[in-house]
Amino acid sequence: MSRVGRLPIAIPADVTVTVTPDNLVTVKGPKGELVKTMHKDISIAVENNEVIVTRHSEQKDHRALHGLTRALINNMVIGVKQGYQKTLDLVGVGYRAQLQGKKLVMNLGYSHPVEIEPIDGITFETPAATRVIVSGIDKEKVGFAAADIRKWRVPEPYKGKGIKYENEVIRRKEGKTGKK
């Protein structure tokens, strides 16, 4: 059995999980609703406030899908119950972020401001001029939106300037030593 896949997923009291025969999983909770189609070779059952994920055979790809499916459903349950968020820090002289309506506008040293529209289900917050919080109920979309913001200025290894995740450690390099 898969170490991850064999564990049942506990369903909180205010969350409902429904599974159709064609493996369409719907998770509803206080923060919203998520729908995802899972692979047909994995069986998903809801019993006694738990979701149980089983596989039909011991093929290598079925073993891999077993843990993946369980993790995806667990992420959906956590998302509709608590939600997900990623925090980004802007490090650099003049690097700033602000909201204009729902749109995120950042000054990152380019000749123009960078404007990013949030994708469906994602919200941006700027508690400080150099901090951006990306939040939503879908873990995949939150990570995608945060990576989309970060790609505009990936942290460089010499001074550490750029957009980094909150607890990310930038591996630093030593500069040139020069002639003596």
Swiss-Prot record:
Part of the 50S ribosomal subunit. It comes from Clostridium beijerinckii (strain ATCC 51743 / NCIMB 8052). This is Large ribosomal subunit protein uL6. This protein binds to the 23S rRNA, and is important in its secondary structure. It is located near the subunit interface in the base of the L7/L12 stalk, and near the tRNA binding site of the peptidyltransferase center. The keyword Ribosomal protein applies. The gene is rplF. One of its GO terms (molecular function) is rRNA binding. It comes from the Bacteria. GO terms for cellular component: cytosolic large ribosomal subunit.
